[in-house]
Amino acid sequence: MTVKVGINGFGRIGRIVFRNAVEHPDVEIVAVNDPFIEPKYAEYMLKYDSTHGVFKGTIQVSGSDLIVNGKTVKFYTERDPSAIPWKDTGAEYIVESTGVFTTTEKASAHLKGGAKRVIISAPSADAPMYVMGVNEKTYDGKAAVISNASCTTNCLAPLAKVVNDKFGIVEGLMTTVHSYTATQKTVDGPSAKDWRGGRGAAQNIIPSSTGAAKAVGKVIPELNGKLTGMAFRVPTSNVSVVDLTCRLEKPASYETIKAALKEASEGELKGILGYTEDEIVSSDLNGNANSSIFDAKAGISLNDNFVKLVSWYDNEWGYSRRVLDLLSYVAKYDASH
């Protein structure tokens, strides 16, 4: 089945979700809304991307609509989500990627325009969070607004799930070495709530907070209260890496842990958890669609109960693909219940 989808917010994630949708067999984008971009500029921004290259396809503007690979995509510029006429386009599933409407109450505004479900492409304080490969099977169709969690949670959770299922995690600390994002500054500037975050993104390694590790406890209840973490924002434009240092319940050699992750990457988590023994660096994974790519050669073990595991993620491309995978999963569930 093909799901008709609308996107609200045509920023980094909105546009990368759109690019991924062109390749996704289950999804058709029929409408986009962004109050800050007019259609001609949206065409330009979708066509040319400094990180992911030129769009592989055709894009034109016809009146106020985009024509992408010959198909019409309605383009709206509404500031109020409840005013977007999703019903007119047939869009039942909405990707909420503004970064502004991240609570159930705010994102529910889309339902007034005819949307059936809203998937927030960010963590949410109150909407149920789902991570593909980890807890999507707990979806029961009751919530009209759900969250795809964060890119870092999507990287960490599959890794933590395999390790916890096989060996048990007593406790763990996560560090994500994260590429800079749109919220940061090109040169030093005001950032009242996060002084360090206001420093020049391309000049500094910037310690930062992240709720990604604690959020794993929401998608894997067994790990609730057992993980926390922090971030370093670094001067790279895309691709990030998670370092999970954890204490294991059952003793296991590093080789045994590697084997378990390799098996999962070829089995139940294929397409979500990748595995590599190559001598890779971050740019090698630009455009990788996995949520998490375990780097077998980068991790270390102090003893059979204390281990550091390293896993990469394209924080734009891989995450955006999961947004669509979750959306597709939810639509299929809804159609059969």
Swiss-Prot record:
SUPFAM superfamilies: Glyceraldehyde-3-phosphate dehydrogenase-like, C-terminal domain, NAD(P)-binding Rossmann-fold domains. Its EC number is 1.2.1.12. Keywords: Cytoplasm, Glycolysis, NAD, Oxidoreductase. PROSITE patterns: GAPDH. The record marks H178 as: Activates thiol group during catalysis. D-glyceraldehyde 3-phosphate binds at S150, C151, T152, T181, T210, G211, R233. Homotetramer. This is Glyceraldehyde-3-phosphate dehydrogenase. It comes from Podospora anserina (Pleurage anserina). The gene is GPD.
